[in-house]
């Protein structure tokens, strides 16, 4: 089994998880890289993506696991061939063997850009940091069983808010990503819910890095 580290940026953030899977399957075929298939009545290509992204979220650290029918291709060749077959915004950074077990993924760093047409409100960073220093910030979360209320604070390891321009405030957080997991979009939802006067005109989300249970970069 091999693993690819790839980015998903630009307009590609609007490609759904299922469509991204299909995109990669087609890319392997166009690149002349034959994937193995699962056994059984409905064989499927041996390819999977860890920690599916929400629609509209950018990422610098996505992981794709796959298995080829042959070992005649070098990792560098696989990387080059895939990038030639993929769409703009989906870019493979490296291909390697011997990656960590996905079950050991525990945390991720995310960036949330709050954009204000009329400029970042005065003391916004201080008010938002005060919000996330509380013991309880409960927001609504959509799950398989419907909408539930969830206190997101126990799933936040680090948090900061910093103005990066006159119109943009950057939230940076390290959050749990498995068992339990916190969708970074809930950070923006919390600002809108608890600090409506600081609700931004637009929010951009990005996954920056992923870590194991020891908070070591995961690959």
Q: What kind of region is each of these model predictions?
A:
Residues 76-86, 123-132, 187-188:
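Short amphipathic alpha-helices in soluble, non-transmembrane regions
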Residues 36-66, 99-101:
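Short, charge-patterned binding micro-sites
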Residues 59-113:
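Ordered, amphipathic secondary-structure segments that act as subunit-interaction surfaces
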Residues 14-18, 72-77, 122, 177, ...:
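Ordered, soluble secondary-structure elements with a strong preference for glycine-centered loop motifs
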Residues 6-8, 66-72, 112-118, 173-179:
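Short beta-strand-to-loop capping motifs
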Residues 5-7, 11, 15, 19, ...:
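Extended, well-folded interaction surfaces typified by the phenylalanyl-tRNA synthetase beta subunit core
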Residues 133-219:
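Core RNA-modification/binding signature centered on pseudouridine synthases
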């Amino acid at each position: 089994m091999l693993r690819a580290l790839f980015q998903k940026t630009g307009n590609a953030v609007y490609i759904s998880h299922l469509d991204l899977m299909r995109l990669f399957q087609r890319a392997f075929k166009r690149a002349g890289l034959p994937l193995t298939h699962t056994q059984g009545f409905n064989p499927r290509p041996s390819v999977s993506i860890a920690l599916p992204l929400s629609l509209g979220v950018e990422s610098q650290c996505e992981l794709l696991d796959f298995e080829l029918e042959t070992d005649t291709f070098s990792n560098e060749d696989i990387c080059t061939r895939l990038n030639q077959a993929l769409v703009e915004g989906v870019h493979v950074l490296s291909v390697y063997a011997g990656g960590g077990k996905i079950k050991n993924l525990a945390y991720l760093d995310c960036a949330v850009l709050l954009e204000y047409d009329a400029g970042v409100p005065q003391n916004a960073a201080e008010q938002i940091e005060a919000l996330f220093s509380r013991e309880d910030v409960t927001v609504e979360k959509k799950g398989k069983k419907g909408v539930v209320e969830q206190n997101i604070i126990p799933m936040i390891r680090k948090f900061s808010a910093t103005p990066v321009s006159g119109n943009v405030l950057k939230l940076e957080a390290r959050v749990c990503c498995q068992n339990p997991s916190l969708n970074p979009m809930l950070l923006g939802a919390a600002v809108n819910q608890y600090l409506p006067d600081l609700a931004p005109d637009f929010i951009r989300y990005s996954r920056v890095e992923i870590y194991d249970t020891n908070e070591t970069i995961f690959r």
